Amino acid sequence: MDQSVQERTRIKNERYESGVIPYAKMGYWDPDYAIKATDVLALFRVTPQPGVDPVEAAAAIAGESSTATWTVVWTDLLTACDLYRAKAYRVDPVPSSPDQYFAYIAYDIDLFEEGSIANLTASIIGNVFGFKAVKALRLEDMRIPVAYLKTFQGPATGVVVERERMNNFGRPLLGATVKPKLGLSGKNYGRVVYEGLKGGLDFLKDDENINSQPFMRWRERFLFCMEGVNRASASSGEVKGHYLNVTAATMEDMYERAEFSKEVGSIICMIDLVIGYTAIQSMAKWARKNDMILHLHRAGNSTYSRQKNHGMNFRVICKWMRMAGVDHIHAGTVVGKLEGDPLMIKGFYNTLLEPHLNINLPEGLFFEQNWASLRKVMPVASGGIHCGQMHQLIDYLGDDVVLQFGGGTIGHPDGIQAGATANRVALESMLLARNEGRDYVAQGPQILRDAAKTCGPLQTALDLWKDISFNYTSTDTADFVQTPTANV
């Protein structure tokens, strides 16, 4: 018998003899795999079903997120299947979490369409999350190779250009979300924008669910908001903005609203995460082409990012959104009302801002990541924060952040402008103390009290909110160190 025929017969007997072969034996498990610089790497937290071997579970994830199906198929012989099969190459037990494992998986770059978040996610978080062999599955982190990153636009504007456009350097930007988020008329909505900006804020913002409802249509909102922006800019001499939410039912509607926001002079527009990855990338390309800052509200993310054993970690969304091309994304506050472990939040901010990431297990960063000159994304901190926390916000979050005080501005007893002034004075006093070399974290409450002696709105705010905080145990915490929720 011809040798090539014998070889094919051997392959058939070993590889295709039975209809169902364990994934590990099909080539989806390779502990000796040599990782290539062009490989896409993913780390999954796996909870196998009782009786399922962790290695087989990892191999199954690799198979189902790349080329495999439930049975052997002959058409594998028509492809470079050894190349295209994802390889699970490492399985580690999760510290202090029995029955959970970290599975490291490598994917060849040719498995993914260039510049497409939708195609990347269709494999990585596709059918595999419903696979019966695993009780729960969570995507914890990814390494995106430089060769693949270079096929993405990255942030439309970026932190550096945004600061130049705002003529604002050396401090966090200040913002607020219009409240109540639903129900205001266009004229009253615009008045909120004007009062907040005149009081000292840099930005006002639409909330995630204000689009074009019967009580206020989008065009009316845009016109009244920009009237407020222009009047506040003229009176203050500062560059001001308002995030005009262009989220809509179709891409045609979103483009129409975005074009109108540009026509009326806005420097920034806004979209929601729920519009989907393709729509986000489309709007990012529009924003780059039209020289607009693009703000992304992460509406909906906690439906799949909050639980620790299933879904995906928000740091992965941060990476995808930096690739997709947004300029802002809400990334947590540590001290506010929303989920936020200090180390996890630090990892999110570093993912958005740093040009290069090293492995940092306490912050949940499992891979080294070179961002290949993609611009930085400005993190946004919002949700339950107020001026009495200013020293902690600066300490935790740094200068490259937008601090969004919604209720902490509009809930001020003396009015919106007074609330904005309280936040601006609190920020300026803390930065002055820091620049003077004082321990602004330890002395923060006293610094605020001293500043309030000459600022009535700040004193009123401190009296009202005092040291109110939201001290609940975070559901998403580090696996490698103990990180109690910030007690602030």
Curated annotation (Swiss-Prot):
Compartment(s) of residence: Plastid, Chloroplast
UniProt-annotated binding residues for substrate: 127, 177, 181, 298, 330, 382
Modification N6-carboxylysine, positions: 205
Alphabetical list of SUPFAM superfamilies matching this protein: RuBisCo, C-terminal domain, RuBisCO, large subunit, small (N-terminal) domain
Site (Transition state stabilizer): 337
Active site (record annotation): 179, 297
Catalytic activity: 2 (2R)-3-phosphoglycerate + 2 H(+) = D-ribulose 1,5-bisphosphate + CO2 + H2O; D-ribulose 1,5-bisphosphate + O2 = 2-phosphoglycolate + (2R)-3-phosphoglycerate + 2 H(+)
Keyword Cell division: no
A GO CC term attached to the entry: chloroplast
Residues annotated to bind Mg(2+): 205, 207-208
Record note on cofactor: Binds 1 Mg(2+) ion per subunit.
InterPro entries attached to this UniProt entry: RuBisCO, RuBisCo_large_chain_AS, RuBisCO_lsu_C, RuBisCO_lsu_C_sf, RuBisCO_lsu_fd_N, RuBisCO_lsu_N_sf, RuBisCO_lsuI
Obligatory cofactor(s): Mg(2+)
GO biological process: reductive pentose-phosphate cycle
Annotated EC: 4.1.1.39
Keyword terms: Calvin cycle, Carbon dioxide fixation, Chloroplast, Lyase, Magnesium, Metal-binding, Monooxygenase, Oxidoreductase, Photorespiration, Photosynthesis, Plastid
Pfam families reported for this sequence: RuBisCO_large (PF00016), RuBisCO_large_N (PF02788)
Class in the EC hierarchy, top level: lyase
HAMAP family from the UniProt entry: RuBisCO_L_type1
Note: The basic functional RuBisCO is composed of a large chain homodimer in a 'head-to-tail' conformation. In form I RuBisCO this homodimer is arranged in a barrel-like tetramer with the small subunits forming a tetrameric 'cap' on each end of the 'barrel'.
Function: RuBisCO catalyzes two reactions: the carboxylation of D-ribulose 1,5-bisphosphate, the primary event in carbon dioxide fixation, as well as the oxidative fragmentation of the pentose substrate in the photorespiration process. Both reactions occur simultaneously and in competition at the same active site.
Protein family membership: Belongs to the RuBisCO large chain family. Type I subfamily.
Assembly and interaction partners: Heterohexadecamer of 8 large chains and 8 small chains.
Protein name, as recorded: Ribulose bisphosphate carboxylase large chain
Organism the protein comes from: Porphyridium aerugineum
Gene of this entry: rbcL
